[in-house]
Amino acid sequence: MKLENHRFSFDFVALEKLDTSPGDLFMLCHPHNPVGTAYTKAELHQFAEWIISRNLYLCSDEIHCDLILDSESKHFPIANISPELAKHCITLMAPSKTFNLSGFGCSFAIISEPELRVKFKKACQ
């Protein structure tokens, strides 16, 4: 993350320097917690290209998607960027943060790629 004009955003220069291997998992908090950045579609597209180009998996924690306080910003699920990215993506969501339901025990993972869903289920056992 980098701070520019009072807003945190992706540091794509730093991302390019990361040592990654195909199949590695990258965790994203979207919108970002604790800084609250709701990424723009342009930022998400650029980030998606980086994920796909390196053949990484992306786990996007979008539990705060309903807690965007900036009326100018909107949440856009990163898996909706492209069908290609969706194949690499695990999206995590739950009502507990937004609706003050801690202890409710209701969360879910959206995984459109069947093989990735199988890997996720095995990892959860």
Where are these regions (language model features)?
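Short secondary-structure boundary/capping segments
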Residues: 17-18, 81-83
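A conserved amphipathic alpha-helix that caps or lines the catalytic cleft of carbohydrate-
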Residues: 51, 79-82
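Hydrophobic residues at beta-strand termini and immediately following loops
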Residues: 1, 78, 92
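Nucleotide phosphate-binding site architecture
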Residues: 65, 79, 117
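Conserved core segment of the aminotransferase class I/II
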Residues: 82-125
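Substrate-gripping "pore-loop 1 plus following alpha2 helix"
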Residues: 72-76, 86
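A structural preference for long, well-packed, hydrophobic secondary-structure segments
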Residues: 75-78, 108
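Active-site phosphate-binding strand-loop segment of PLP-dependent enzymes
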Residues: 3-73
